[in-house]
Amino acid sequence: MTIFEKTGPVNSEETLNIALKTAKERNLDIVVASSEGDTALNLMQKAKEAGFAGKIVCVSCAYGSKTPGENRFSQERRTTLEQNGIRVVTAAHALSGGERGLTKMFGSVHPVELIAYTLRMFGQGTKVCVEVALMALDCGSIS
């Protein structure tokens, strides 16, 4: 297990290296979260260089996560990834989705949000890993 001193994108490079190394050693596929495609493109390049032959699934944010009706992931990046064998999944966030709307409107907390808050106690990255795995599983990209 690796524990980083600081949070955020500063850890992406090392995290991708660890994920690739572990996936190769254990013959695993990789699910990667990528809001705008930068992390997925970086992983794609690293995977090619490392000779990684497993499946890579990229999970992007749902439409409207930043601007109503828009997706932060450009079609150009999606096409590049897909042409290189990476499946791009765009879906409602598994640990917020509809419940977050109810919380905002009625001021209550619902079970799925409690799960998300519990996972965040281990770190935002832990919550994101669980969430994108659920999203990839829900749409049939992994089994």
For the regions a protein language model found, what residue spans apply to each?
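Gly-rich Lys/Arg/Thr-decorated short loops/hinges at beta-loop-alpha junctions or inter-strand turns
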Residues: 1-3, 113-116
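General beta-strand structural signal in soluble alpha/beta enzymes
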Residues: 12, 31-34, 58, 88-92, ...
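Internal alpha/beta core interface subdomains
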Residues: 115-143
